[in-house]
Amino acid sequence: MKKTFNQTMPCAVRLAALLLVPVVCVAFFGCSAVPGSSGSSAAEPSPSPAAAEPAAKPDLPSLRPLYQGDENGYYTFMTAASGDYQQVLYADYQTGTQAPACHITGCTHDSPSCPACFFTGVPVTLPCPVGDGTYLSFVYGYDSDGMSIVRLNQDYGVEQVLYHCNYISSFYCCTDGSSLWFSTCPSGDSYDRIKRLDLSTGGITTLFDAGDTSGQSANIIGCTGRQLVVSVSPYYDSSEPQTSCLYLVDADTGTAELLREYPITNASAGRTTNISTAVLDDTLYEYDYTTGELTATGLADRQTCTVTDALPPDPYEGRGAFDVTITRILNGQLVVEYYSNDWTDDNAETKTPVYLVDLAAGTVAEKPALPPLNWNGYDHTSTTIMAQLQDRLLVLCRTEPYTRTTTGTDGAPYTIQSSHRYFGLISYADYLTGTPNYTEVGMLD
């Protein structure tokens, strides 16, 4: 008999969101040599190959990010009105309906026998479709301490534990439908490795490691074809020069090529380098905070061109944290999000404008904002994007206030004013023009 999560998970398990979009590149000390790769956890450094177009692999699918949904729908958690349990819900884009993720005919979805109900704990991530009816999840404490990658059955119960470790990064994982690429720090080690997991056999291969210096991390920040873009960083130490490095790693062989080295600067501005990076549509985009220049480098031919130098400067002129995040490409427009605040003025509002860069013309325009949403007493002007589909975005689109009752530490009940948040689909065109034309598909909380 196959177990379900709610029959095995301990109470201390906490839910963590699966993040898909990398925000900043990170750092690595001593990047001039390529770290160990090609299936060995302690391989000798190998020289970087010359920049060249990667060999074609027509018989193998391209990699894609793993997340809690696909073109057909999206998984969420919801706490039951009674507060006794949580449910996994599935929002179906085709029907526009949201329902418990349970395939048992006649189930009332309110007892431990329902695989969508969790009375004693929840996985770290929701079901993540990888194709052909296969789902993965990242869970804490399944059978032992630490974290596991598990394959789920059709009722979202644990079918097989594929990999177990003390730490697995679920922030950015890639799949081709048959394998999973992820970052992990094995038990007893102090630096990260990029591993490939065969989803059929559970076989594990180390493709790339961050070296043997304590505290070094390696994180996947993007993918192109069957290659990973990996950012390698050290534990920050202001007493010595350090650099942040990007590598292009072959997902099959582990062959690594050093793409970039960025000096780590003073972290007082809220970031560690003067370059913000993103990997979109087989291209590495880089924004230079010092010059204001935005460039694009093709990951196949390594040709670099200037996209624009017309992005506006920091609204608060360096008086606080300032972040520029390159997020996505929609209808030929590169979406660039700003975050700026003023540490010298306690009353200053955080500014979060969004700019659109026309990739053909290089022109820059501020994106018209969608109407702000108010929840828990505050206006939220930034649009929360949950997923990007082929021609639509899944976004938070509506809120609704409500009153809920809970119990204090003294056992006495009390009420809390809160908000339900709803999500829906919006076309690229409507998002870019700030037109709130949503197709609502579900409730987030």
Locate each region found by the language model.
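C-terminal motif of bacterial Sec signal peptides marking the signal peptidase cleavage site
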Residues: 27-30
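Hydrophobic alpha-helical transmembrane signal-anchor segments
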Residues: 21-24, 38
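N-terminal low-complexity, Pro/Thr/Ser-rich intrinsically disordered segments
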Residues: 42-69
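Bacterial N-terminal signal peptides that target proteins for export
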Residues: 4-19
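Bacterial signal peptide processing site
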Residues: 32-35
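Surface-exposed loop/turn elements that mediate protein-protein interactions on large endomembrane-trafficking
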Residues: 50-59, 83-114, 144-164, 189-211, ...
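Repeated scaffold domains used in trafficking and secretory/extracellular systems
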Residues: 59-70, 112-129, 167-177, 213-225, ...
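Short beta-strand elements that form the blades of beta-propeller/WD-repeat-like
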Residues: 64-86, 123-141, 173, 178-186, ...
